[in-house]
Amino acid sequence: MVVLTSTERLVETNGVTLRVYEAGEPGAPVVLLAHGFPELAYSWRHQIPVIAQAGYHVLAPDQRGYGGSDRPDAVEAYDIHALTGDLVGLLDDVGAQQAIFIGHDWGAMVVWHTAVLHPERVRAAAGLSVPPIPRARSRPTERWREKFGDDFYMLRFQEPGLADAEMEADVAATMSGMFAGLLTGRAPLPEWISADEFEHYVTEFSRTGFTGALNWYRSYDRNWESTPQLADTKINVPALFVGGTADPVGPTMNPARARELVAGPYTEQWVEGAGHWVQQERPDEVNRILLAFLTEVEKS
């Protein structure tokens, strides 16, 4: 089992308490790692020590709704302003003005939004599996219904309690299905995760449930309604997108449109044969890509 070679502590910020894993020297440039759905800071277990050893101060929180962090009851507590505010608050906690933000899946969406909602705090931004995409012209749930129909999983996630109960009925089946690239149903564990590593996820989500995580999806429309200014806002810092060529998620988000949002230096890297959980599936390749990006950012 790979363990987190870092210090764990609780940080009070932005009205919540977050469990944060921290590695590297205080005062060094900060790299903040934001996990996705349904993950934990543990999903960065292969990146935290490598980035810290490269000379960075690494912060990897369980984001609100997950793991050892607070799980507010109100759906409104999970909007994009709260989520980006949490990450900015972690910079305040360590006395850093800026950080290089790296996110996976939903964490990537939070990172891209941090770059436009709090540009003064972002030195550079990287997203794994979810590219920077411009603001939609219509409400997300309306667009999904038109494009995918009423049975689309993100629409099913909108109903409080429904998906929560289904996923919590058998957490091991939920997580194995997710990691195998399915939305439901037990599946054999992929080779990239050990039984002990898998059990870490099962134990945590058995304790916390999935409601906090699903509330991120239930905030999609609210996020769209509260950010009309993003239609004319660009990401001006260095940006990186890393995708897996076997990931069913990334291509559906049309990474070719990234340049509509990113005005600064932009790099796109694909990991051949990798699926959605790219930083866990192919840690060595992803680490090489991330370290090269960090080096380029430091030069700029």
Task: Tell where the protein language model's regions lie, with residue ranges.
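Conserved beta-strand scaffold positions in the cores of enzyme catalytic domains, especially
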Residues: 8-10, 58-60, 268-270
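Active-site helix-initiating loop/hinge in glycosyltransferases
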Residues: 36, 79, 281-282
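Signature tryptophan residues that serve as conserved aromatic anchors
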Residues: 37, 41-44, 106, 112, ...
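Active-site loop/turn elements of alpha/beta-hydrolase fold enzymes
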Residues: 63, 130, 273
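Flexible "cap/lid" subdomain of the alpha/beta-hydrolase fold that forms the substrate-access gate
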Residues: 2-7, 16-18, 66-102, 106-266, ...
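Catalytic active-site module of serine/aspartate enzymes centered on a nucleophile-bearing elbow/loop
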Residues: 265-300
